[in-house]
C-alpha cells in the first residue's frame, strides 16, 4: 500500500514531556507498544509526507534511537523541527488556536473558559470564581498531569501546582463541565498545506483515553450536528484548517488531531479546541480501520 516505514511509539507523549534524548520510557509504556503491535497495521494510509519514516510521533528520544540503529540523520527531523514539535505540543498552543478561531456562535464556547496560570494565586482566583476546575500540566502523557479540584486547592493540589509551575512554567486551568460527547477533527500537515482527514468519536475516563467508536465520518458528523448546526461545524473545520496552516506548514510534517467536546451548561455547548496532538492518535487508527474495512 505504501513504501513508508511506520513506527508505533505510543510512549511519545512521555518522551515529549521529558525532552531528554536519553530518556528511557517506563517499561509499561514500551510494553504497551509491543503488546499492541498489530495496531501499526492501521497507521498506514495514503499521505503526502516527504519522509520515508512515519512514526506515531517525532521526539528527540526516537531520533537518537534511529540514528543509533544506523538511520542517516539527514533523513530525520532537524533539531529545530523537533523543538517546534515539543513547543507546540504544550497545551498553551491549543488555547492559542482556540483564541484565533472566529466562530461567533452562542453554541460554541470561547477560549476564555480556561487560562494559562503562572502563579498559585491565579489558580486559586480562577477556582474561587467558578467553584471547580480542571488543572493540567502543559506537557504530560495521556491521563497524566491532570487534576480535578473543587472549592479550592488541597495541600496535595497546591504542592502539585508549585512543582508543575517550577518545572514547566505554567498550569492550564479550565472550567469543569459535564461532558456529553468527545470527538476530534483529524488532519495531515505537509509541505503544500493542511488536509482535513475526517472525524473521530471517543471516550475518556478521568482524562485518560478509554476507547474509540468505529463509525463513518457522516455518522459522526450527524451526532455532532445534533448539538450544533452543520454550518457552524463547517466554519470550525475551515477555521481550524486555516489557523493551523498559518502556524504549522513549513515547520511540521505529519498527522495531528484536534480534540473537541460537547458539554452541558445551561444548554449544550461545543468546545472546538480541547487538546491538540501533533502526532498520530487513536482516533486516526479508528478512522483508518473503519475506512479500510468499508472501502
Set out the residue ranges of the language-model regions.
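N-terminal "leader" segments that precede or initiate the main folded domain
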Residues: 1-47
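Structural motif
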Residues: 7-12, 56-61, 176
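Conserved N-proximal alpha/beta basic substrate-recognition cap immediately N-terminal to
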Residues: 29-128, 141
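Glycine-rich phosphate-binding loop of ATP-grasp-fold ATP-dependent ligases
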Residues: 113-114, 132-158, 182-184, 206-224
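Extended, Lys/Arg-enriched charged tracts that mediate electrostatic binding to polyanionic substrates
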Residues: 120, 127, 138-144, 150-151, ...
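Phosphate-binding site of ATP-dependent enzymes
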Residues: 131, 156-211, 257, 261-273
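A conserved active-site cap/scaffold subdomain adjacent to cofactor or substrate pockets
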Residues: 198-251
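ATP-dependent carboxylate activation and anion-phosphoryl transfer catalytic cores
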Residues: 231-295
Amino acid at each position: 500500500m505504501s513504501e513508508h516505514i511506520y513506527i508505533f511509539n505510543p510512549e511519545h507523549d512521555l518522551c515529549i514531556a521529558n525532552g531528554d534524548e536519553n530518556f528511557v520510557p517506563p517499561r509499561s509504556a514500551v510494553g504497551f507498544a509491543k503488546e499492541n503491535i498489530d495496531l501499526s497495521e492501521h497507521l498506514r494510509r495514503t499521505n503526502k509526507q516527504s519522509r520515508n519514516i512515519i512514526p506515531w510521533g517525532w521526539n528527540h528520544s526516537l531520533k537518537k534511537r534511529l540514528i543509533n540503529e544506523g538511520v542517516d540523520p539527514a533523513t530525520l527531523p532537524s533539531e529545530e523541527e523537533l523543538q517546534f514539535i515539543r513547543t507546540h505540543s504544550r497545551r498553551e498552543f491549543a488555547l492559542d488556536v482556540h483564541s484565533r478561531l472566529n466562530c461567533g456562535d452562542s453554541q460554541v464556547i470561547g477560549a476564555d473558559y480556561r487560562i494559562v496560570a503562572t502563579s498559585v494565586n491565579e489558580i486559586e482566583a480562577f477556582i474561587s470564581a467558578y467553584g471547580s476546575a480542571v488543572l493540567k500540566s502543559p506537557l504530560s502523557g495521556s491521563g497524566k498531569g491532570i487534576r480535578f479540584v473543587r472549592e479550592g486547592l488541597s495541600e496535595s493540589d497546591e504542592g502539585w501546582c508549585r512543582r508543575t509551575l517550577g518545572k514547566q512554567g505554567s498550569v492550564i486551568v479550565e472550567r469543569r463541565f459535564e461532558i456529553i460527547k468527545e470527538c476530534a477533527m483529524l488532519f495531515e500537515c505537509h509541505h503544500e498545506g493542511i488536509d482535513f482527514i475526517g472525524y473521530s468519536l471517543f471516550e475518556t475516563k478521568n482524562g485518560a483515553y478509554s476507547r474509540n467508536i468505529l463509525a463513518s465520518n457522516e455518522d459522526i458528523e450527524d451526532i455532532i450536528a445534533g448539538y450544533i448546526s452543520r454550518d457552524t461545524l463547517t466554519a470550525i473545520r475551515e477555521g481550524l484548517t486555516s489557523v493551523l496552516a498559518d502556524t504549522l506548514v513549513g515547520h511540521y510534517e505529519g498527522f495531528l488531531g484536534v480534540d473537541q467536546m460537547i458539554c452541558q451548561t445551561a444548554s449544550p455547548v461545543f468546545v472546538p479546541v480541547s487538546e491538540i496532538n501533533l502526532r498520530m492518535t487513536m482516533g486516526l487508527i479508528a478512522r483508518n480501520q473503519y475506512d479500510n474495512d468499508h472501502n
